[in-house]
Amino acid sequence: MTMKGLFIGAAMAALLSGCARTSITSTGGVQNYMPDNAVIAHRGTIYWAPELTEAAFRWARNTGADYVELDVQRSKDSVLIIMHDKTFKRTTDVAVKFPGREADPIGSFTCEEIMTLDAGSAFNKKNPDQARQIFAGQNVLVFEDVFRIAEGKRIKRNTDGTRVFTKDESGKYHFEYEADPADNGHRPGVYIETKIPDEYPGLEEQVYDELARIGWNPLVGEIPAAEEPFWKGDRVNVGNTRGKILVQTFSRPGMMNFKRVFGEKVLASFLIGNPKTNEFAKPEVTDEIIAFAKECGAPFIGTNLGDANDGLSPEFAGKIHAAGLKVNVYSFNTVEQMEKYFGPGEGKKSAPLADGMITNRTDLTVDFYNARKVRAYGTEKTPQETLADLGYNQ
């Protein structure tokens, strides 16, 4: 891979709140390419639509997420595939389409095999209150799909509902998209999580190259203007800024690979998993996590909500912030959870524990921040109305 992108530091425009965005050479640097109190749509949504599907990402975009979050793996024929689990068993009909292969890893299937899977019916079965017949037949997505949806497009389909694509003599796939007639103008960024990258050698380089190919690598080609705002009026505009992507992983080798490939010039977050009880109360544990995040050039740490004695305490949040880092927390489902992480802080009610929320309920989180006057707009429609606008009727 040839990395020719230049990242030019420049003074950035004032935010809606009046706080200045600093240049790459100033205190905070790349960290300031993300808005404070960012709403990050976890897998699009896992509540209102089948996770990581076109329906989930279109809904998150139109609901006003600042970022849509995805999980990326790789098919047998080297196509980047959007899937969280190590297998297709939980979210698709793989047991029906490919009997005996339910426990096979994602990387053992070709892209064409993957495109035959139904990624919607399992959601309907598990979530009868949110089930919609039209979700049946939702596809497992490829990497490019999510970015085109973020641009206001949708997958182009044949009359039978199958997606339009071609495959050239070299085996390379070419996917087609069209303007989404239900697009409402929000332009979110994309939060990219590599899953089990140790099992996919060169995954970080492939992500870099694919981002460059589809016009989403902020280090290649035309660099977004320093003055480009996070919002334009009441429309999200993060997807057109220098903070248009964030890369993250739980893998420590993967984090070091991100540092090598992206050169600490894009947003990055070091994910930490579920702690044992009171583990994050141990200074040696939290100090080491913070030290590694800084070593790999990640200005963000991502941690989970945890239970009463786990997760992000005021003390841990204080240490992260004192080290010059920020923390985004996953994954919110209720207003009560949001209140816990927004209200308390390091001894001050005005200092939230979480700098951003990775949420399964973008609708709730957008309105939560709006009600607390840290976001200029709330949702315009109910989640059900948004789904109907997008063509996902009952």
Summary of predicted features, one role per range:
Residues 19-394:
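Phosphate-group recognition and catalysis centered on beta-loop-alpha active-site segments
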Residues 1-7:
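Bacterial N-terminal signal peptides that target proteins for export
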Residues 9-17:
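Bacterial N-terminal signal peptides
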